[in-house]
Amino acid sequence: MQTIPDTLCYLNGEYGSLRDAKVSVLDRGFMFGDGIYEVVPAYGGKLFRFDEHMARLDRSLAKLRIANPHTREEWLERCRKLIAALVLQGAAQQTPGSDQIVYIQITRGVALRDHVMPADVTPTVFMMCSPMKLVTAEQRHAGVACVTARDFRWERGDIKSTSLLGNVLARQISADHGAAETIMFRDGFLTEAAASNVWVVHEGAVLGPPKSEHVLEGIRYELIRELCAEVGIAYNLRPVNEADVFAADEVFLSSATKEVLPVTSLDGQPVGHGALRGKPGPVYARLHEAYERAKVTQSI
């Protein structure tokens, strides 16, 4: 059984121990998965692309018709307080200057069970901060293995919803195969992975699926575009079919915790061609270097 750490968390206006945090069994997040979440990385205690995460939080809340319960400044203050408490406590043997993840969850709130959205309900707001689980040097050097699956999830992947059963089932497919991620296709076209966006490289250009209701617009969507422009790599969002992925020169993942991570094996077959077959490629390497620079310049 996992031990819940005795770290500071925020719940409905109060700070307290994560071990003691409780919500009502009638909370609609518990009953229906009726809520949204955000995961904001922090490097050396500084929040990375904070405003972009807040903008996506606003978009998700608007799609669920939930009013944002806090201002940007209030969110920033709470995030920084949780980070400072974690660093001070030295949770999980962390030291000052290490990296953290702030998890934010907002549900519609507590109401009698009914599928119809209730009026005049106060949202439940929960926040916690954890040490970031870093990608290992070996994973960066050798890349990771992924498997593929049909995208069997619901039609609103654009909402960062707490209703994640489809993603859980998808991620378990790769876990059962000892792989890092499950890359999914809907009607033969790439959507995303269970907990990552997916990018392919063809003839030196980075390609990704277009923004749609089937794909969560990861914060790294815009970041990858910016980094490609910075280092002179072509970038294009267009439909990417299954054959494009398996024929790609490179494949890589992006997410808050993976940052950019090369995929070197797909369904047991090496990714890429020639001398770089089954190895991280040069486009990934350039983007990783640019990402490292961005972590310094785009954190507050």
Describe each region flagged by the PLM.
Residues D187-K211, E217:
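Glycine- and Gly-Pro-enriched alpha-helical subdomains that act as flexible
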Residues K211-H214, R238-V240:
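Short, glycine/charged-rich beta-strand-loop motifs at protein surfaces that mediate ligand recognition
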